[in-house]
């Protein structure tokens, strides 16, 4: 509000406390008496002078007032009171500024009051008047000298009038807002009532109807949407998301739902679900637990469980399943299934494995195997009890029978039973007070005694444990002596704690040991080849005495010691025989699986070891320090897969410890065989020459050699063949016999596995199992096994008689099983050779492998798609056939260097049994042509003329001629060495 000059005019002068005194400059009204014309001129001049003085004084005073107005105005603006010597004009100026501030504050207050005022217009007018009077009263209280001043009153009235439009507008706006709020409030109540207990699927229809009602009440869509959003968020805060679900049906003209347009609703849905989860933790836990159990039981697969988890997270706001929890569950289940598969393999190996069974597996696997047997036989017992409905003693009898079967299996595999160790520990804790009046055998003791009776005698120490078995034997001895169960247990406890042996006991024990060693060393009475040498007897006696003393200290009686010494020595000391009456090599250690370890038939082990000694005889004797050949023996550690050659009863090592793989069984057998053939042929030649000299050409006829088969030689061994009439008559090994057959087969399957899935696609490294992966033909698993529709439907693959699951999270397809599956697939792809010149079984193993590789890659009848090759195979011209197959190195009509390499490898596989040159290089050129190079000179004796003519003098042969655009995508140009 501007202060105008006219607003402060006409005021009387005010007394000033500074400057000229009021007495000196006070304004006076000078009255001039009328004078006669003849009056004194002096008096007139005097009066005129006084008037001039008054005019000057008035001007000065007016200027003083104006200055004071400005000064008081500035003081008011800075919040200061008027000065004590302010003029009336200055005081009014100060008052106007204060009035301006007060009026503005009062206007803002009235505008704010208007928003909350609930009276009528008359009451509002009274409220405004009262507010004005309050301002005016405060003004007069502050400036009492201006009270009643008309000009000041007019100024106050004008100030109020200037603010009146604002106050009126605020009142009208507030009235409109209150009306709108009333409509919104009414609609809010309507929404709350109309949507109470309405489920989510019906909420959308209810909200759409309410939206129509809102528009009829002059509520805009935006206002309605905001109201619904807020109410939905409020409900979500207490775990109810029904209204939020309904907002998904409220769509604008563009078809976008309110839910999608308002982020608050989306976060509100999550909050509602989380609140629900917090309020229903038990229910959520039950849902999760049921899902986990269903998954572990195989009722849900991985995809189904993920969908269940997604549903749980949707109803719980993402709190039910975290990423780490999901991964942990899948990893745990995958590991469990992989472990189960591994245990099944162990159990199967125990059922059908080598004579040594599971002695070469790790300690952890042995414990796992024992645990697996507990689970397996407990399940079998429970299944039979359920099936038969047995109860009470009948059910216990079934459990006892399966427990005995379990102990028998542990004994067969020499696996220590953890349950027996636990029972032994509890029995050793029984005090004399507990045992004093004990008349009945405790359950723990019954378990140990049942185990002892169920386990083969020579396996009891290994299965039960040395001290545990000694305890059982001593308890049995005490009961035979008439002790009560309590007394017998105490007797067995004391025997188990003994550690010193009297001299008389030692003498008796030594005599018993001498008898056992003599029995073992004597070998067979019919054939003397397996009788132990004197050095072997000395070695046995030394170790037998050590074992006997240890067992005696542990508490074993002499009968038990003798039985176990005999079993141990028979397994750990073997005098191999080379023929009925010829002693072979002495072996310290278990030889029952030595043949498998060194890659030879078990019957050929004596021949292999003898050939090894012959090959290194001089070096071994030089290192023995003067020992003889008969003093050398093999010290074999089957568990570690190591051996040492020692000399004499002093066990002097003449070689360092070496892996058993150093003994190349097949190579040594081949060397021995070739030597025997040479000796036989020379002897036969000399014999026939003598016969010719004695009887003439017509007097002697060489007998026709007897025939044998590769299968017979493989099962009975080379040594047996060398002693057979067939060999003596001049027959050599069959043409399709192969040294290192098992090793070569293993290498072949490993090669195919690497070729089919060298990157190990689909292998779950956490669980150690294979899962399906996609390839060009669909879904495969393991080493290129194509999943059939039936397998996909069943969820398992049949490998032999085993049904093996393969789905992610449930897979039990371990690498070992994947290799068995590959072997099964390879054999199933063997082409039919019914009308071939050479049946498949009569082919050399190398040719068999080459054909299996082709058929596995191309399909069982894929060879028929190459007519020239197929005709050659049928005619028995295998080299021609494999060379013709080189031109099938294409995929989808494009030439592939990778496939050409594989065809060349198949050719090389087929040549493993002969002297035909192999392919050493493959070349691909930019013009699309492809070539292979043979490592040696090809002869017409090996291939047909047509093929021989294609091979250059440098060994290179063109497989494909040049052709633009013929190479498959990704095919590399250049040479590849095989």
UniProtKB/Swiss-Prot annotation:
Pfam families according to UniProt: Phage_lysozyme
Q: What is its main location?
A: virion
Q: Where is this region: Disordered?
A: 9-29
Keywords linked to the UniProt accession: Antimicrobial, Bacteriolytic enzyme, Degradation of host cell envelope components during virus entry, Degradation of host peptidoglycans during virus entry, Viral genome ejection through host cell envelope, Viral penetration into host cytoplasm, Viral short tail ejection system, Virion, Virus entry into host cell
Any idea where this protein resides? Virion
Sequence ranges of Polar residues compositional bias: 14-29
Report which superkingdom the organism of origin falls in. Answer: Viruses
Single Gene Ontology BP term?
cell wall macromolecule catabolic process
Alphabetically, the GO molecular function entries are: lysozyme activity
Q: Which SUPFAM superfamilies match?
A: Lysozyme-like
Gene3D superfamilies, per database record: 1.10.530.40
Taken from the UniProt entry, a GO cellular component term is: virion component
What the protein does comes down to: Exolysin that catalyzes the cleavage of the host peptidoglycans during virus entry.
Q: What is this protein called?
A: Peptidoglycan hydrolase gp36
Q: Which organism is it from?
A: Enterobacteria phage SP6 (Bacteriophage SP6)
Gene encoding the protein = 36
């Amino acid at each position: 509000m501007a202060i105008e000059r006219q607003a402060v005019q006409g005021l009387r002068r005010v007394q000033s406390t500074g400057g000229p005194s009021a007495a000196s400059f006070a304004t006076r009204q000078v009255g001039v008496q009328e004078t006669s014309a003849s009056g004194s001129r002096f008096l007139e001049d005097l009066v005129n002078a006084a008037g001039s003085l008054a005019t000057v004084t008035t001007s000065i005073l007016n200027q003083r007032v104006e200055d004071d107005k400005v000064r008081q105005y500035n003081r008011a603006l800075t919040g200061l009171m008027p000065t004590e010597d302010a003029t009336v004009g200055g005081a009014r100026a100060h008052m106007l500024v204060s009035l301006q501030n007060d009026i503005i504050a009062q206007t803002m207050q009235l505008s704010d009051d208007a928003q909350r005022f609930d009276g009528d217009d008359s009451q509002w007018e009274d409220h405004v008047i009262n507010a004005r009077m309050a301002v005016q009263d405060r003004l007069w209280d502050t400036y009492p000298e201006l009270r009643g001043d008309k000009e000041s009153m007019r100024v106050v009235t004008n100030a109020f009038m200037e603010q009146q439009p604002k106050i009126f507008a605020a009142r009208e706006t507030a009235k409109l807002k209150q009306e709108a709020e009333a409509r919104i409030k009414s609609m809010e109540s309507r929404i709350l009532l109309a949507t109470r207990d309405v489920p989510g699927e019906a909420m959308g229809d209810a909200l759409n109807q309410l939206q129509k009602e809102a528009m009829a009440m002059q509520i805009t869509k935006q206002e309605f949407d905001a109201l619904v959003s807020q109410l939905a968020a409020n409900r979500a805060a207490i775990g109810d998301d029904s209204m939020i679900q309904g907002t998904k049906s409220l769509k604008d003209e563009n078809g976008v739902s309110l839910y999608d347009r308002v982020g608050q609703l989306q976060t509100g849905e999550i909050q509602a679900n989380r609140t629900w989860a917090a309020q229903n933790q038990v229910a959520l836990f039950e849902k999760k637990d049921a899902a986990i159990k269903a998954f572990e039981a195989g009722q849900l697969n991985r995809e189904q469980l993920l969908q269940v988890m997604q549903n749980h997270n949707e109803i719980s706001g993402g709190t039910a399943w975290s990423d780490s929890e999901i991964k942990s569950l899948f990893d745990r289940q995958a590991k469990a299934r992989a472990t189960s598969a591994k245990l099944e393999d162990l159990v199967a190996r125990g059922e059908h494995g080598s004579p040594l069974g599971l002695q070469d597996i790790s300690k952890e696997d042995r414990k796992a195997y024992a645990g697996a047997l507990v689970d397996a036989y407990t399940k079998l017992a429970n299944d039979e009890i359920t099936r038969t409905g047995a109860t009470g003693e009948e059910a216990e009898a079934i459990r006892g029978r399966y427990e005995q079967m379990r102990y028998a299996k542990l004994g067969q595999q020499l696996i220590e039973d953890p349950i027996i160790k636990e029972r032994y520990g509890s029995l050793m804790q029984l005090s004399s007070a507990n045992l004093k009046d004990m008349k009945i055998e405790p359950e723990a003791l019954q378990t140990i005694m049942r185990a002892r009776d169920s386990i083969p005698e020579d396996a009891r120490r290994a299965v039960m444990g040395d001290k545990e078995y000694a305890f059982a034997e001593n308890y049995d001895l005490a009961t035979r002596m008439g002790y009560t169960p309590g007394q017998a247990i105490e007797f067995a406890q004391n025997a188990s704690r003994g550690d010193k042996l009297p001299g008389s006991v030692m003498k008796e024990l030594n005599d018993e040991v001498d008898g056992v060693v003599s029995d073992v060393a004597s070998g067979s009475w019919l054939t003397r080849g397996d009788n132990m040498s004197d050095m072997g007897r000395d070695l046995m006696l030394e170790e037998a005495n050590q074992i006997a003393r240890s067992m005696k200290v542990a508490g074993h009686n002499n009968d038990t010691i003798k039985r176990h010494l005999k079993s141990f020595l028979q397994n750990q000391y073997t005098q191999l025989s080379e023929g009925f009456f010829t002693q072979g090599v002495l072996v310290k250690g278990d030889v029952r699986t030595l043949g498998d370890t060194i890659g030879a038939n078990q019957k050929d082990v004596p021949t292999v070891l003898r050939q090894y000694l012959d090959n290194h005889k001089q070096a071994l004797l030089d290192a023995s320090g003067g020992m003889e050949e008969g003093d050398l023996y093999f010290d074999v550690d089957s568990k570690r897969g190591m051996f040492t050659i020692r000399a004499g009863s002093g066990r002097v090592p003449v070689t360092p410890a070496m892996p058993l793989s150093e003994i190349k069984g097949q190579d040594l057998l081949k060397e021995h065989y070739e030597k025997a053939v040479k000796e036989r042929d020379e002897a036969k030649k000399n014999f026939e020459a003598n016969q010719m000299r004695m009887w003439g050409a017509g007097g002697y006829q060489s007998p026709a050699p007897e025939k044998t088969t590769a299968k017979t030689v493989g099962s009975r061994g080379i040594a047996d063949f060398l002693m057979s009439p067939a060999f003596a008559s001049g027959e050599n090994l069959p043409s399709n016999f192969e040294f290192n057959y098992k090793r070569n087969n293993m290498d072949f399957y490993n090669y195919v596995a690497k070729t089919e899935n060298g990157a190990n696609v689909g292998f779950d490294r956490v669980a150690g199992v294979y899962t399906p992966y996609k390839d060009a033909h669909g879904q495969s698993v393991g080493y290129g096994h194509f999943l059939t529709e039936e397998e996909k439907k069943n969820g398992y693959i049949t490998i032999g008689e085993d049904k093996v699951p393969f789905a992610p999270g449930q897979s039990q397809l371990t690498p070992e099983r994947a290799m068995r599956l590959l072997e099964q697939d390879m054999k199933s792809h063997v082409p039919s050779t019914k009308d071939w010149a050479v049946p498949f079984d009569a082919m050399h193993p190398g040719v068999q492998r080459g054909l299996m590789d082709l058929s596995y890659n191309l399909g069982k009848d894929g060879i028929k798609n190459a007519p020239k090759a197929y005709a050659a195979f049928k005619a028995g011209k295998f080299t021609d056939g494999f060379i013709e197959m080189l031109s099938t190195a294409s995929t989808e009509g494009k030439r592939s260097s990778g496939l050409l390499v594989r065809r060349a490898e198949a050719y090389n596989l087929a040549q493993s049994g002969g002297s035909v040159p192999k392919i050493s290089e493959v070349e691909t050129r930019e013009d699309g042509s492809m070539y292979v190079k043979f490592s040696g000179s090809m002869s017409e004796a090996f291939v047909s003329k047509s093929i021989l003519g294609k091979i250059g003098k440098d060994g290179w042969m063109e497989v494909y001629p040049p052709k633009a655009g013929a190479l498959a995508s990704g095919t590399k140009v250049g040479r590849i060495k095989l």
